[in-house]
Regions:
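Phosphate/adenylate-binding glycine loop and adjacent helical scaffold
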Residues: 157
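Short, surface-exposed secondary-structure edge patches
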Residues: 63-67, 82-85, 107, 145, ...
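PP2C/PPM family metal-dependent serine/threonine protein phosphatase catalytic domain
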Residues: 125-141
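Protein maturation boundaries and topogenic segments
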Residues: 1-103, 174-176, 180-208
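Active-site loop architecture of trypsin-fold serine endopeptidases
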Residues: 161-168
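Mid-length scaffold segments of soluble, non-membrane domains
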Residues: 103-107, 111-128
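PRPP/pyrophosphate-binding module of the type I phosphoribosyltransferase fold
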Residues: 154
Length: 208
């Protein structure tokens, strides 16, 4: 006995179910392509956000010993100082003011308006001697003093006897701050949050 499809074929009518089946085959391909494109765009967007908000920095030299060692890799928070003001004790990555293509890493010691005095093996800010437990040995200083201008900072390396810093090239403009050092992600034995000392007044270090 002939089926309905047999009758349609014999009478020359097109068989509609076949077209519907073809459409069903093509639709999954379009969906897959769209999902691939959406995934690529989302990946690029996330990559852009991450690179805008953070940076990577490799410690070169010994100016931040013993806090940071040569060859360690850090994650830098580039947005930190859009949300808060830089503080004494913060470790930052900066553009070297005499050659902005080079980046240094130092610790903020003086804020705008601070009077910095160095002598007799100690740093004083506004007349108060700083407690600096992170220093690499006893520093030797030539007696000097400065007043930090507006929108500028006074930065020093933790390894005072082996550091090119504000004692040599003066104040750091705020516009030359790249970001706040946040995480040591390599080498493995030192992995963790970068220690910051708020106000440098003998308080315990704050990480992050």
């Amino acid at each position: 006995m002939a089926t309905v499809e047999d009758s349609q074929f014999q009478q020359g009518y097109p068989i509609q179910p076949a077209k519907a089946e073809a459409r069903q085959v093509s639709q999954p391909t379009g969906v897959i392509l769209r999902e691939i494109v959406e995934t690529l765009l989302l990946t690029l967007f996330i990559f852009w956000i991450v690179n805008t908000a953070t940076g990577r920095y490799r410690v070169q030299g010994h100016s931040m010993m013993p806090t940071l060692k040569e060859g360690e890799y850090l994650i830098i928070n580039k947005l930190s100082y859009y949300l808060e003001e830089p503080k004494r004790g913060d470790i930052i990555v900066l553009h070297y003011p005499r050659d902005r293509s080079r980046e240094y890493i130092k610790r903020i010691v003086g804020l705008p308006g601070d009077r910095i005095e160095i002598g007799n093996g100690q740093v004083k800010v506004n007349g108060t001697g700083l407690t600096e437990p992170y220093l690499n040995g006893a520093p030797t200083y030539h007696e000097q003093s400065w007043v930090v201008p507006e929108d500028s900072y006074f930065v020093l390396g933790d390894n005072r006897n082996n550091s090119s810093d504000s004692r040599n090239w003066s104040f750091l403009p705020r516009s030359d701050i790249v970001g706040k050092a946040s995480v040591i992600y390599w080498g493995v034995e030192d992995w963790g949050l970068v220690p910051h000392y708020p106000h440098l007044t003998g308080q315990s270090p704050v990480t992050g």
